[in-house]
């Protein structure tokens, strides 16, 4: 089976991309264990706790990221440069444990995957 990477690069709640990506990730995890999740650019906001999507009439899917461990999804990476650019601290208690990587290391890790799905 091919190695699959899910890349979240959009902010939550502005579009359905984040929710659809999470749904696809969880569904794919039933078919393969060889997958990883990457959070880059505005996608780092997907992992912030305490969001209030009901204020913009959106569904609160962010808490569902906490289920990644139950689905045996353990390879989670977050772009350290994206965090800095957005004024976020890598020590922030995100809703899922993601390992910060600098952009060049993140690119090298991403190159190990056969299929890259971006949301």
Swiss-Prot record:
One of its GO terms (cellular component) is cytoplasm. It holds the Pfam family DsrE. GO terms for biological process: tRNA processing. Keywords: Cytoplasm, tRNA processing. It is found in: Cytoplasm. Its main location: cytoplasm. SUPFAM superfamilies: DsrEFH-like. The keyword Ubl conjugation does not apply. Belongs to the DsrF/TusC family. Heterohexamer, formed by a dimer of trimers. The hexameric TusBCD complex contains 2 copies each of TusB, TusC and TusD. The TusBCD complex interacts with TusE. Part of a sulfur-relay system required for 2-thiolation of 5-methylaminomethyl-2-thiouridine (mnm(5)s(2)U) at tRNA wobble positions. This is Protein TusC. It comes from Escherichia coli O81 (strain ED1a). The gene is tusC.
